């Protein structure tokens, strides 16, 4: 929850990761693999860096050998100072990493159900995701976030649109928090289950 975050700790983390130099942070949490759309995200970021030098990407998760990213993408992640890759992060700290993000991006090709999107929405982050199985049910389009295709140019354009409009980001973020509260909090899910069996 956003209200649980200690701002002093958040600022310390921001400085430690080198994100204090940037005014806009694109966030991702999950495995750093092809299936999650990381190739498209890094390619989109290359496009965005030509427009602005105050944007960063925060990748929270592990590089994996299964479904591994191509070497040129890995090298870009490892050498671009505006791409921060954290590796594994303890669950108890994850909300602080969401707290550093301005938007959350999941350009995935397939998901069971993207809990990372729900976590990000509960932290009042606007979402950019695809219409892949699972992802399609995780947002309300143009209310809590935006859908994109598996295309770096379209992804860059959508991120730039949100970067330029703080009011829309704020609106989507607040609506996303309500969407999660009303549909995915534990007591709501238990009520739905009870209705099925009573």
What label would you give each PLM region?
Residues 109:
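Aromatic "clamp/platform" in nucleotide-sugar-dependent glycosyltransferases that forms part
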Residues 70-89:
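Nucleotide-activated donor-binding/catalytic signature segment of Leloir-type glycosyltransferases, i.e.
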Residues 126-129:
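Short hydrophobic beta-strand element within catalytic cores of glycosyltransferases
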Residues 20-36, 42-45:
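Conserved donor-binding/catalytic core segment of Leloir-type glycosyltransferases
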Residues 141-142, 146-153, 161-167:
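Conserved acidic donor-binding segment of nucleotide-sugar-dependent glycosyltransferases
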Residues 88-89, 96-101:
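Short alpha-helical donor nucleotide-sugar binding micro-motif in glycosyltransferases
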Residues 3-19, 73:
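A short helix/loop element that forms part of the nucleotide-sugar donor recognition site in Leloir-type
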Residues 154, 161, 168-182, 189-195:
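A short, well-ordered alpha-helix in the C-terminal region of glycosyltransferases
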């Amino acid at each position: 929850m956003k209200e649980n975050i200690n701002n002093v700790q958040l600022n310390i983390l921001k400085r430690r990761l080198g994100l204090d130099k940037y005014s806009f942070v694109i966030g991702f949490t999950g495995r750093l693999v092809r299936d999650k759309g990381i190739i498209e995200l890094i390619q989109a970021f290359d496009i965005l860096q030509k427009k602005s030098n105050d944007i960063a990407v925060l990748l929270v998760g592990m590089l994996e050998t299964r479904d591994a990213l191509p070497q040129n993408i890995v090298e870009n992640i490892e050498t671009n100072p505006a791409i921060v890759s954290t590796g594994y992060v303890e669950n108890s700290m994850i909300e602080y990493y969401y707290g550093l993000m301005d938007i959350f991006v999941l350009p995935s090709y397939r998901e069971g159900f993207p809990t990372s999107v729900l976590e990000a929405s509960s932290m009042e982050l606007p979402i950019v995701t695809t219409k892949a199985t699972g992802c399609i049910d995780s947002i309300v389009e143009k209310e809590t976030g935006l859908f994109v295709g598996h295309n770096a140019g379209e992804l860059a354009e959508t991120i730039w649109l949100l970067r330029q409009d703080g009011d829309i980001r704020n609106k989507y973020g607040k609506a996303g928090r309500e969407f999660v509260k009303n549909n995915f909090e534990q007591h709501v899910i238990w009520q739905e289950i009870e209705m099925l069996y009573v």
